[in-house]
Structures are given as structure tokens and as C-alpha cells.
Amino acid sequence: MSLKVDGFTSSIIFDVIRDGLNDPSQAKQKAESIKKANAIIVFNLKNKAGKTESWYLDLKNDGDVGKGNKSPKGDADIQLTLSDDHFQQLVEGKANAQRLFMTGKLKVKGNVMKAAAIEGILKNAQNNL
């Protein structure tokens, strides 16, 4: 089932992330990401119409990716809130997470260092877009 949501152009990225984590050739990276992050990360994205949607990335248990502000296996350890456009730019390598954070365009609730652990997963998604 697709994680794409109408009105959120970047939502297709969550399908790409899920497919990458489920790819048997990426099993080593998946295990490393889970070990490094050990967190459930929720992405709260706001589109141009002002609507907010959430997706989770469970890097605490099994590398699951899904729709919603909570994994079936636990609450979020980290919440990242940003616009749909900025998330797309971040994954495409056109925006810098640190710069978005410093300018208030990326809000982080929880352990900022654990949030940095998803960099490899986003980079892999960028390569598969």
C-alpha cells in the first residue's frame, strides 16, 4: 500500500524509503541505521494549503515506514516538523538540514543527535528518486 497522500508532493519519498529499507541488498545499511538511530522518528509535513500529515520511520524495532504520528510499536522519540517543500528539497540534496534548523524551517522535538542518524537513509532515498 502506497504512503502517498494527495496534496503532498514529497509523500512519495516515504514509499522510496520503505522500498529501500525492504530491499534485501540494503539489509546491512538497514541494520546499521537501526543500531545507530535506535529511535522512532515522526515527520510532520505541512503543505501549501496548510494541511498537516505525518509519517513515521521506525528505526528502533524493524525499520518499518508508515503513515501516522505513531508507530504501531511505540511512540515517537523524535519529531521533525517542516514544510512539504523543504522535506523534498532536503531529500533531493537541495537544502541543508542544519541550515533549515537554524532558520526555524525545521523544528526538532527530541534528541537532535538521533535525528542526524537518518542522513544515510535520506541519501539512499535521494539516489532512488
UniProtKB/Swiss-Prot annotation:
Q: Which coarse location class describes where this protein primarily resides?
A: other
InterPro entries annotated for this entry? Answer: SCP2_sterol-bd_dom, SCP2_sterol-bd_dom_sf
User: What PANTHER family does the annotation carry?
Assistant: SCP2 STEROL-BINDING DOMAIN-CONTAINING PROTEIN 1, STEROL CARRIER PROTEIN 2 SCP-2 FAMILY PROTEIN
**What is the species of this protein?**
Yarrowia lipolytica (strain CLIB 122 / E 150) (Yeast)
What more the UniProt record tells us is: Expressed essentially in cells grown on palmitic acid with small amounts found in cells grown on glucose.
What positions does the domain SCP2 occupy? 10-129
Q: Which gene encodes it?
A: SCP2
UniProt keyword terms in alphabetical order: Acetylation, Lipid-binding, Peroxisome, Transport
User: Could you tell me the superkingdom of the organism this chain comes from?
Assistant: Eukaryota
Q: Does the keyword Acetylation apply?
A: yes
Q: What does this protein do?
A: May play a role in the transport of fatty acids. Binds fatty acids and fatty acyl-CoAs including palmitic acid, oleic acid, cis-parinaric acid and palmitoyl-CoA (in vitro).
Q: Which SUPFAM superfamilies match?
A: SCP-like
Protein name as catalogued: Fatty acid-binding protein
**Motif Microbody targeting signal per UniProt: ranges:** 127-129
Q: Where does this protein reside within or beyond the cell?
A: Peroxisome
Self-association state and partner proteins as the record states: Monomer.
Checking Pfam families in the record gives: SCP2
Gene Ontology CC entries for this record: cytosol; peroxisome
